[in-house]
Amino acid sequence: MSIVAQKITYIHPDNQVLFKGIDLTINKGQKVALVGNNGSGKSTFLRILAGTLQAQEGEIIYPTPPYYVPQHFGQYDNLTVAQALRIDGKLEALRAITEGDASLSNFNTLADDWTIEERSLAALHAWGLEHILLSQPMRTLSGGEKTKVFLSGIEIHQPSILLLDEPTNHLDRRSREKLYDFITSCRITLLVVSHDRTLLNLLSSIAELSVGEITLYGGNYDFYKEQKEQEQASMQEKLEAKEKELRRVRKTAREVAERKQKHESRGEKQSVRKGIPRIMMGGLKENAEKSASKLKEVHEDKMENLANELKQMRSSLPDLQGMKLDFSASGLHEGKILVTAKEINFGYAEAGDLWPSPMSFQIKSGERWLIQGDNGSGKTTLLKLITGQLPPRSGSLIRADFSSIYIDQEYSIVRNDRTVYEQAQAFNERHFQEHEIKTLLNRFLFPHDTWKKSCGKLSGGEKMRLAFCCLMISNQTPDLFILDEPTNNLDIQSIEIITSMIRAYRGTILLISHDAYFIRELGIHQIITTFAGRLKTNL
């Protein structure tokens, strides 16, 4: 079944236009990704297609309603699992019939779906949710469990059109791989909003939502990335040509002004020598001034137009090269032992051991480590053990003296009650001058009009850039960089920025992430798998 969206316009309640008159057609069986920077309207557009949000203008055409897996679940917290899956009516009808209520309305509601309860429980079981009841409130579930509840609904409802909004955000590695297998093998029409580049490479087309319009690219993410790099290279050439033209026009304008000044001075002297009547001389001067004024106006208009074109081109081609972690090298020599763990395990009070078997490992300076495992398997607990925030229940853990910086998925070092400039100043331990702070903010794509913006209103990508800008301002070169799911709330461009910055870092890295693409690009050396309590090496 196909999806046709025609002339869709959405305007925020504050009358700000998000997008106007956009079109998208997805053919039967086509698997398409919808990508774009944070704030471009991807999730809003998906909600309009799903019918959970009303557009101001436009038309959506599809033969059967799509099944929608949302990104955020707050609106479902007061519902049961059955209600969130929209099967509560059938379950109530089935229960009423089995208890002797043979009314026609119950049979119509059930629609011969006599196995609805068994099918639903089997679908939940397939996603590892056998411990969850259909009558259980959604608010009692974790983010990963809520996602898997909605993913189980695909098997229950068997839709011909499927809409997924950031489906891997809360999933661990095993659940992601299950979703990847489904996407690869399914034959339904699919539209996915995601920053998971492994998932995006499984799709056949990329639809980019940018500046209020959708551009369709044939091929998966890697092909799309190549196309975008070519477009940006071409845009860079045009930008440089425009800059060159603007310099030429400014030079010409200066030369014209200088010639005019010289001509006027020479003309006055000659008129005095030749005895030209004052009235005639005034007329000649007036004509010359009109001509010069017109020429000046032409040059000024041209310069203004070129300057506006350059401003638009620069905004569509941000300077990502300026965002680098210019930390000095860590003071530790490569290969120094930072942490030695021997047969460690952890547990709270009367609870048993967290891991099935104790763990032993050794972290040396310059290495890049990944901690992986299922949700709830103790990855963050292990981080706290390594950094000395928690003691092990058993075994020994020896830590050398080293400095570390912790970056979580919320970028919590950025305080929501500060403005962008206040946040930067809070890390100004080197006593930079005001203009130096603002120069660094500009380097990290925070221009003048963002300095008074509340940090609470920043997107995930903006918080990431500001967090790393603050680290640059403080120049606290860490011996160990700890990254806890750093890509979870970022758009693709922001992920590529943080990848570039972390790759350039020359110290030790300890990473928790389920993003296989990100892990591969960082060049991980060692892996600790917490769910099995064992150490693996060589990714």
Describe the function of each predicted region.
Residues 1-11, 90-143, 147, 227-350:
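Coupling and communication elements adjacent to P-loop NTPase active sites across diverse families
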Residues 5-8, 17-27, 58, 341-347, ...:
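Conserved beta-strand
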Residues 22-33, 188, 359-370, 402:
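Pre-Walker A (P-loop) beta-loop-beta motif of ABC nucleotide-binding domains
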Residues 31, 44-106, 365-368, 373-374, ...:
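ABC ATPase nucleotide-binding domain signature region
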Residues 75-140, 409-470, 474-479:
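ABC-family P-loop ATPase nucleotide-binding domains
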Residues 144-163, 462-482:
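GG-anchored amphipathic helix commonly corresponding to the ABC/SMC/Rad50 NBD signature/C-loop
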Residues 162-166, 171, 407, 480-485:
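Catalytic Walker B motif of ABC-type/P-loop ATPase nucleotide-binding domains
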Residues 202-218, 522-537:
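H-loop (His-switch) and adjacent beta-strand-loop-beta switch element
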